[in-house]
Regions:
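Residue-level signature of catalytic and energy-coupling elements of molecular machines
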Residues: 38, 44, 63, 89, ...
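N-terminal pre-Walker A segment at the start of P-loop NTPase domains
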Residues: 2-6, 11-16, 385
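C-terminal effector modules of nucleic-acid-centric enzymes and ribosome-associated factors
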Residues: 30-33, 149-151, 297-407
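Conserved catalytic-core segments of large NTP-driven translation/proteostasis enzymes
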Residues: 163-303, 309
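Conserved Switch II/interswitch segment of TRAFAC-class P-loop GTPases
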Residues: 90-95, 105-127, 134-155
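P-loop NTPase switch module centered on the Walker A-proximal segment
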Residues: 10-98, 107
Length: 407
């Protein structure tokens, strides 16, 4: 479905400080902001970028991140080295673990925020393991809110953090004392960000664009001739896409016929591409991206296409409700104050899976050794080798209990 009269009406550029060429030449990183609720992730992000990632009224009212927030910036270190950084602000609330896992699927490295006045919380542990499950190895630990504690308390908290990460993927990660509110050590964080390793990017394979958000950017009352098409936001996992390319989105939209639910893929054309507020001609892996398309906005408003995948038409696997995983479980439930031992998966058990930017619930239909087969409530695009977070409903909350890989 197409939106009327948008082909020559590209999204308005709001920041003209950099040309297309400059932006496309910069090294790019996706950084996840993770940690317990109210430890200062969003405030820290505002100091690093000059903007808040929370843009939803419900989030501003409640003071917590509910959906994934995004903020892009160009950082420059003391030697004049520049990088383009896309930050993904992941929810820290225990009931929003699925959204956090979706965010972890998008990132190259992470900033783990721990408040010095509160210390290590259950969600801190859960998020650290989630990063491991999503194969995120580069982590910067921020000891935030040092202005709220004494010197002795700060030293004790620092030692607690070092003890906490010993034996984990973050054992050798730097721990930076910070006060986001007072702008203490913000430049030190930027220095470290400028030196993180850039992952090897695959620009030659068929593209896989992971859609985390979708929007209608038109204001009420916009004249037809000024309408923009639906916007898709996320990251390009591999391949390249350029203005004018036709893309196919799967699973697409849900259709219901005679009480039977099916999914129909969507085909559209890329009208313009933005990295943050900067227009670019061609999208490559690294950094968050927004594609304006020819889709009718009714299909993209309110994140209705979040969790889908886009590529060149007829290149993605067929969607499926049946998948097979190789899996591994943790010893105990993370994110709980008291220890809860994780029991083995059971036949017919319902578990939640986080696959790239989507989540779905599935019923276990077969178990053999460390492999399971599931029947899913919502179909996925099965990309072999993709990491999958596994969660179980414990005390009415979905808790991360392990991870797997699509086989």
């Amino acid at each position: 479905m197409k939106s009327p009269k948008i082909k020559n009406n590209k999204m308005k550029q709001t920041d003209k400080t950099n040309s297309r060429e400059n932006i496309e030449e910069l090294e790019m990183l996706n950084i996840g902001m993770v940690g317990h609720i109210d430890h200062g992730k969003t405030t820290l992000l505002s100091k690093l970028t000059g903007k808040f990632a929370d843009t939803h009224s419900e989030e501003l009212k409640r003071g917590i991140t509910i959906k994934l927030g995004y903020a892009d910036t160009i950082i420059e270190n003391s030697k004049g080295k520049k990088r383009y950084i896309s930050f993904v602000d992941c929810p820290g609330h225990e009931m929003l673990m699925a959204t956090m896992l979706s965010g972890a699927a998008l990132i190259d490295a992470a900033i783990l925020v721990i408040a010095a006045n509160e210390g290590i919380k259950p969600q801190t542990k859960e998020h650290l393991i989630a990063l491991k499950a999503k194969r995120v190895a580069q982590i910067i630990i921020i000891q935030n809110k040092i202005d709220l504690v004494t010197k002795e308390e700060a030293i004790k908290n620092y030692n607690d953090i070092k003890k906490f990460v010993k034996g984990t993927i973050a054992e050798n990660s730097p721990v930076i004392p910070v006060s986001a509110q007072q702008n203490i050590n913000i430049n030190k964080i930027k220095e470290i960000l400028s030196e993180l390793k850039i992952p090897e990017r695959d620009t030659t394979s068929k593209p896989e664009f992971l859609i985390a958000r979708s929007f209608d950017i038109n204001k009420p009352g916009t004249k037809i001739e000024n309408l923009h098409g639906g916007v898709l936001a996320g990251i390009l996992k591999k391949g390249t896409l350029k203005i004018g390319d036709e893309i196919e989105i799967k699973p697409g939209i849900q259709e219901k016929h005679a009480n039977q639910i099916s999914y129909k893929s969507l085909k559209t054309k890329i009208v313009s591409i933005y990295r943050g507020t900067h227009p670019i001609n061609k999208a490559t892996p690294g950094g968050s991206l927004a594609f304006e398309t020819e889709l009718d906005n009714i299909l993209t408003k309110s994140d209705s296409l979040s969790g889908t995948i886009a590529s060149i038409p007829n290149t993605l696997p067929e969607i499926t409700n049946k998948i097979k995983l190789k899996y591994s479980l943790f010893n105990e439930v993370l994110g709980e104050e008291k220890e809860i031992k994780i029991e083995s998966l059971k036949l017919s058990e319902m578990i939640m899976l986080s696959v790239n930017t989507t989540t779905t619930v599935g019923k276990i239909t077969r178990i053999k050794d460390n492999e399971i087969e599931l029947s899913l409530n919502i179909p996925i695009v099965p990309l072999k080798g993709d990491s999958v977070g596994i969660a179980r409903n414990i005390h009415n909350h979905w808790r991360l209990i392990g991870f797997g890989e699509i086989i």
